[in-house]
Amino acid sequence: MYEYLDRRYALALYEVAEENNKVDEYLRDLKEVVNIIKNSEDICKILKHPEINTSRKKEIFTELFKDKVDDKILSFLLVLIEKDRILYLEEKLKEMEKIYLEKNNMISANVKTVIPLLKEEREELIEKLGNKYNKKIILEEEIDKSIIGGVYVRVGDDVLDGTLSTRLKDIKKMMLKRE
């Protein structure tokens, strides 16, 4: 249920951003606000504190962000405080990023390897994924020593798992079944 709400909030803000030709600015500002909330224990305590009323929380946010973000973003943040959804701002940001990718015929691909991909490997992977999904690929690379070797790719709900750790687990399962 909340994913649906996150999507609705994100879509509403995206439409406002699009009308004002400020999609990139809004995404950047929201990322900054999310980072500030995540990295500030004081702000988290204020937002979670049951004895600090909604009006005071809104005043604090207005003081913090009035000259740092667009007025429409500030209004959005205040609505989230009013609806007690501000602690879920990151989910709304992620939904807004998804909407941005969808509207621009792009898709995000998360790639895990033990060592960084070479330039040629990265380009080939982007090309193959682009052909498969018929979209521009935004590659997010991650180094993960636990996969031992190979490559793990997640695009949306699709997973391509060519990791050594998964192969070893599969072999172990096969051997245990035989016993």
Swiss-Prot record:
Q: Which organism is it from?
A: Clostridium botulinum (strain Langeland / NCTC 10281 / Type F)
Which family is this protein grouped under? Belongs to the ATPase delta chain family.
Q: Its principal location?
A: membrane
Pfam families attached to this UniProt entry: OSCP (PF00213)
Where does the record place a coiled coil?
Answer: none
Per its UniProt record, what InterPro entries does this chain match? ATP_synth_OSCP/delta_N_sf (IPR026015), ATPase_OSCP/d_CS (IPR020781), ATPase_OSCP/dsu (IPR000711)
Which named protein is this?
ATP synthase subunit delta
Q: Which SUPFAM superfamilies match?
A: N-terminal domain of the delta subunit of the F1F0-ATP synthase (SSF47928)
Q: List the disulfide bonds.
A: none
NCBIfam families on file: ATP_synt_delta, PRK05758.2-4
Q: Could you tell me which Gene3D superfamilies the record lists for this protein?
A: N-terminal domain of the delta subunit of the F1F0-ATP synthase
Which top-level group of life is the source organism from?
A: Bacteria
User: In the record, what terms sit under GO molecular function?
Assistant: proton-transporting ATP synthase activity, rotational mechanism
